[in-house]
């Protein structure tokens, strides 16, 4: 992992205007009969794995024909080994004076190598480096070395005339090149299909690209397995439009006088739609606000939708129900700040709400000495289908959904959860406000009153009205 590797020919980021402290060249001598002066460089540290190197009186370098130019780049241990060393050569064609000049560059570690007058190589015995060349036909050459070895790197530049594979020393032609060298965390900041992340393995700190949408490579530039634009658009639309399944539950909740529940469903539908529009990899992305805010609101809305639906099914007293709604919102917000992607963030509140529901129904069944809700139609056509749909959605979310099938499994999850709400949300209590004449004529005495709507599971135990059927 610490061995040098070259890759890519992408444009490099601009240079900063400020300079840092100079680095002294090591003065290493190549295994030849010549000694070359090594030109020092300036080091400007900007951030983690972000260093720019400059030469004195640069960035343009004049290369006389009689000798090469050698530059030393010092990479510090730990601080520089986890990034990408980038180098760019650009030939100034106006300085050639119609000479057929080619400028060669040889980048080696610890020991500079000589570039001969005829055969141009960048290796000798057990030492090998990276060779670059620029000419009138190819004026720009780029080199990138991820995770470079620390120590001193030597760049040797030499101008030769003629046409390959054999060259000769130029007689009276001074070439001018522009040299740029810097260290960056990732290759081109990973481009539009990746994200540069700072990672740590044991005590080793390094930066790497996390590619999306099937893109691969050091800089997320390998499109061999990349998703097409049409596929990205399809997945985005499917994830966003599947949230429209919350419209029927919103309408049903409003018709049933569950205004607070309808507001929660609307909140969930809105933020889930725009969160998935912002969460997509690649170029099919639309963000109306910060990604972290959208993610938090989407997760909170999803959990609150489950919470308010189950609490509404318990048919508690209004004060108790409002307290549980507020308490659930605060506890769910805290849980999401701790871990947004934990499975228990979904199962925990759901199981707790189901416990409240089971307790309320059990107490009501014991008091009335029959099952609650009492009608088999409510169980057969609403509760059982709704529970089956909601359980299927949880199983898909917990055990089936992966990164590869996310876009359609999660879309199904949206539709199943929204569909289950339409079955599980209890209906509105229909009470008759007309007062019978006999109700006012009765005096004191004991009466056993049975509210038909309450027995059908349509009103709470505190909802008895004067329209109840009373038996002395």
Swiss-Prot record:
Coiled coil stretches, renumbered: none
Cytoplasmic face of the membrane: 255-257, 314-315, 364-379, 427-472
UniProt-listed InterPro entries: EGF-like_dom, NGX6/PGAP6/MYMK
A GO-annotated cellular component: endoplasmic reticulum
Parts of the chain that traverse the membrane: 234-254, 258-277, 293-313, 316-336, 343-363, 380-400, 406-426
Region of interest called Disordered, as start-end residue ranges on this chain: 1-24
Residues glycosylated per entry: 100
Post-translational modification: N-glycosylated.
Compositionally biased intervals (Low complexity): 1-10
Main location class: membrane
All copies of domain EGF-like, residue ranges: 182-221
UniProt topological domain (Extracellular) ranges: 1-233, 278-292, 337-342, 401-405
One GO BP annotation of this record: cell adhesion
Subcellular location: Cell membrane; Cytoplasm; Nucleus; Mitochondrion
Disulfide bridges in this chain: 186-196, 190-209, 211-220
Subunit structure: May interact with EZR.
Family per record: Belongs to the TMEM8 family.
Protein's name according to its UniProt entry: Transmembrane protein 8B
Organism, scientific name: Mus musculus (Mouse)
